[in-house]
Design a protein with these regions (language model features):
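Hydrophobic residues within well-ordered alpha-helices
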Residues: 19, 41-42, 90, 129-130, ...
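Short helix-initiation/N-cap motifs at beta->coil->alpha
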Residues: 13, 28-41, 82, 99-102, ...
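Extracytoplasmic small-molecule ligand-binding "clamshell" domains
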Residues: 1-52
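Periplasmic-binding protein-like
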Residues: 70-78, 103, 141, 145-192
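Ligand-binding cleft/hinge of the Venus flytrap
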Residues: 2-5, 16-25, 103-120, 148-149
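A ligand-binding cleft/hinge motif common to bilobed small-molecule-binding domains
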Residues: 39, 51-61, 108-109, 130-163
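Flexible hinge/capping segments at coil-to-helix
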Residues: 69, 78-95
Length: 192
């Protein structure tokens, strides 16, 4: 995620820094809309996506995923003053989500009475919650838990929603050299 100072933060950034160090290069970060993660790989705009990327069968048809490095489910963060602790509390309310995410898929399928307010960028979605443009925000639970820790007045009332999914880096289909390197790094970091 991007913090208040405009700096990239989170495990993906830590992992990218480690990959770059071991490759002997400086990482070049590209801000990517969640819905465009596959497109930036297939169009050769980036070599690797480390953007809290959930492995799905549909995505596997277009990109190659490395070994997973995290398991997640969905979480829901809301203001402490109007905390959401159950999906049923969202009926008739506005839920902020990022386009192209598993949260979008889950709520479109399972919560037809929830009004979805969709944003291209995570930063815009978080800002919408800060500004009170929605009642809550949903994305991967690791993301909302980290965000709520650094944003006073907000709390994750639903910490585990939907299926457990895996998060993994992705490379262009057929880029076995980079895929193998990333897989080796994941194994190495797991030992560290």
């Amino acid at each position: 995620y991007v913090d208040k100072d405009g700096k990239y933060q989170g495990y993906d950034v830590y992992f990218a820094e480690q990959l770059a160090k071991d490759l002997g290069v400086e990482p070049e970060y590209t801000s990517v809309d969640p819905a465009a993660r596959v497109d930036v790989l297939t169009s050769n705009k980036v070599d690797l996506v480390l953007a809290n990327f959930t492995v799905t069968d549909e995505r596997k048809e277009k990109v190659d995923f490395a070994k997973p490095y995290m398991k997640v489910a969905l979480g829901v963060v809301s203001p402490e003053s109007a905390q959401i602790t159950d999906v049923s509390q969202l009926d008739g309310k506005t839920l902020i989500i990022a386009k192209g995410t598993t949260a979008e898929t889950f709520f479109e399928k399972n919560a037809p009475n929830v009004k979805l307010q969709k944003y291209d960028q995570y930063a815009d979605a978080y800002n919408a919650l800060l500004d009170g443009r929605g009642d809550a925000f949903s994305t991967d639970n690791t993301e909302v838990l980290a965000w709520a820790k650094s944003n006073k007045g907000f709390k994750v009332g639903i910490t585990h929603l939907g299926d457990d999914d895996t998060i993994a880096p992705a490379v262009q289909k057929g880029n076995t050299e980079l895929l193998n390197f990333v897989n080796d790094e994941i194994v190495k970091l797991g030992k560290d």
